[in-house]
């Protein structure tokens, strides 16, 4: 296989080949479509894509960011490497690696990329690999089951709270549409990030998010005319069916007793089932998401370390060892460590 590196939106010929790939790709998501190059929420470096070709057809697509010394493609909970169904994933991964090495040049030290499916013979290509379990796993729903069957797979707690929420006639879930709704949700977004100690997105990017009907869906919960919550989703509407991903939520704490977020999640599942999407990735696997049923899916992380004695790999292993040791400690000991470092 050979490869092509892109640093911007593709030309007409490449776009056609890319669209053909998406129709036969396993787990196509928004961030492995050409829309990756125009999405306002890609940050952290220069964005690029590597396309692995087998003849005239694309066999795999990888998107990511290049920071100079590091190339990163996706996260454990959000892979940005996808293969055509039935393709030789090892051969495709080799072509993708060659493309990333060319993209990074002499200054490149380490590559990290993530996949939904395992890459056979990855060690022979020079990769270290890891199954992303635990907190790096995701809840995945098979939308082919249909909304009614999926609802029955929800936990009893989730079914009960949804039935109660749906009885509240003043609580509705709808698409984010008007400027007034955008203003209300943006105010919640700013306050939510303030509580978390994060920087909010710009009002301009927020407006673009609401305007994007091809790759994103934002659902809001409105109670007595007031926006009280909003959840953001990304999706790929490939001809063969794509994946929808939970991308984030902002909500008002004082209205959580109304259960707006579970209701938004349910309406999103209903919409996805009705719109030819094949899988719903919840983007994480904590208890709130597990109550939607589905499978706990562990994706794959691959690292290619070019440094002397593989410095980056060793640093990452030490970090995981320290985190694992910390989590194993009694709560009282963890509290003292937090106090010592001024962590609240």
Show the residue positions of the predicted features.
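Aromatic (often tryptophan-rich) hydrophobic motifs at membrane interfaces
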Residues: 53, 61, 84, 94-100, ...
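A short, structural micro-pattern
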Residues: 58, 75, 104, 132-135, ...
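Active-site/acyl-donor-binding loops of N-acyltransferases
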Residues: 66, 122-149, 275-344
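Amphipathic coiled-coil/heptad-repeat helices and related helical stalk/stem segments
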Residues: 92-93, 158, 202, 265
């Amino acid at each position: 296989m050979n490869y092509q590196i892109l640093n911007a939106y593709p030309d007409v010929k490449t776009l056609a080949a890319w669209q053909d790939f998406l129709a036969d790709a396993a787990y196509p998501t928004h961030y492995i479509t050409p829309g990756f190059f125009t999405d306002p929420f890609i940050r952290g470096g220069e964005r690029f894509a590597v396309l692995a070709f087998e003849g005239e057809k694309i066999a795999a697509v990888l998107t990511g960011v290049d920071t100079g010394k590091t190339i990163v493609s996706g996260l454990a909970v959000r892979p940005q490497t996808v293969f055509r169904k039935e393709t030789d994933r090892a051969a495709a991964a080799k072509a993708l690696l060659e493309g990333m090495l060319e993209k990074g040049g002499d200054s490149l030290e380490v590559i990290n990329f993530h996949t939904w499916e395992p890459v056979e013979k990855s060690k022979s290509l020079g990769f270290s690999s890891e199954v992303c379990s635990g907190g790096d796993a995701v809840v995945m729903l098979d939308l082919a089951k249909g909304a009614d069957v999926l609802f029955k797979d929800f936990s009893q707690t989730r079914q009960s709270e949804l039935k109660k929420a749906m009885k509240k006639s003043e609580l509705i879930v709808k698409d984010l549409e008007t400027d007034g709704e955008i203003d209300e949700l943006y105010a919640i977004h700013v306050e939510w990030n303030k509580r978390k100690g994060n920087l909010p997105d710009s009002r301009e990017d927020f407006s673009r998010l609401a305007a994007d009907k091809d790759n994103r869906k934002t659902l809001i919960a409105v109670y007595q005319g007031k926006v009280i919550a909003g959840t953001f989703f990304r999706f790929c509407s490939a001809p063969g069916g794509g994946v929808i991903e939970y991308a984030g939520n902002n909500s008002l704490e004082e209205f959580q007793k109304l259960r707006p977020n579970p209701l938004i999640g349910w309406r999103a599942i209903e919409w996805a089932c009705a719109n030819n999407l094949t899988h719903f990735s919840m983007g994480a696997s904590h208890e709130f998401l597990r109550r939607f049923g589905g499978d706990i899916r562990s994706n794959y992380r691959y690292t290619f370390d070019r440094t002397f004695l593989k410095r980056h790999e060793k640093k990452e292993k030490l970090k995981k060892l320290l985190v694992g040791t910390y989590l194993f400690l009694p709560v009282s000991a963890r509290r003292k460590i937090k106090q010592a470092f001024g962590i609240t």
